Amino acid sequence: MSIEAISLHKKFGRVHAVRDLSFHIEAGEFIGLVGPNGAGKSTTIKMLTGQLLPTSGSVHICGVDMSTHPNEGRSELGYVPEFPELYTYLSAREMISFVVDIRGRGDVEWALSLTGLGDDADRLIREYSQGMRRKTAIACALVAKPKVLILDEALNGLDPPSVERVLRALDEVRAQGTAVVLSTHVLDTLEKIATRIIMLKDGSIEHDCLPSALKDIRNQFG
């Protein structure tokens, strides 16, 4: 099992942001994590990636408890935050190579090709558009071919051709056995690629279903 969330609760003072959240995600699954603003998506992702400790409950990445052994769990985890931080004085090739050096594995040219950055790989990141910066962050997350890949609103700022390119990249790593979790408001995207949809509402799971149920879910977004 790639990801297991067990009875997750997260409170911030009196605010109960996540309530009794439980699910498991197998290798090769592509999960679309959706929900209105304030549903608990970002809090959930931060607990999955070990950035936030749950008030109660636990997260396991590839069998590793993220509360007690976060570094071991992160060794099998690729992550793209909603607002990625990059070293803009580097080129994309240098940035991705830096990640490979840290992780101790990875194929820079494969990641550049997969995300469509090859022609611009040696330009400085500070010269990039927001969309190209986001693709660089995605390339950094998948270069080491992690067993789990988690992306928080990673399609924001991408034009339609770039969205299609990124989706193909994510589908390729999923087909190789990576468990992918994509938080997004772009529901049409999920119909093309997701194997499951998890919809949060008020910090709890409202739906855990197949993409074919997206029509009904879309109505709940208003």
Labelled PLM ranges:
Residues T49:
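Helix-to-loop junction immediately C-terminal to a conserved catalytic motif
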Residues G57-T68, E72-G73:
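Conserved ABC transporter NBD signature motif
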Residues S97, G104-D120:
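Conserved ABC ATPase "signature" region
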Residues I138:
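Hydrophobic anchor residue at the start of the ABC signature
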Residues L149-E153:
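Catalytic Walker B motif of ABC-type/P-loop ATPase nucleotide-binding domains
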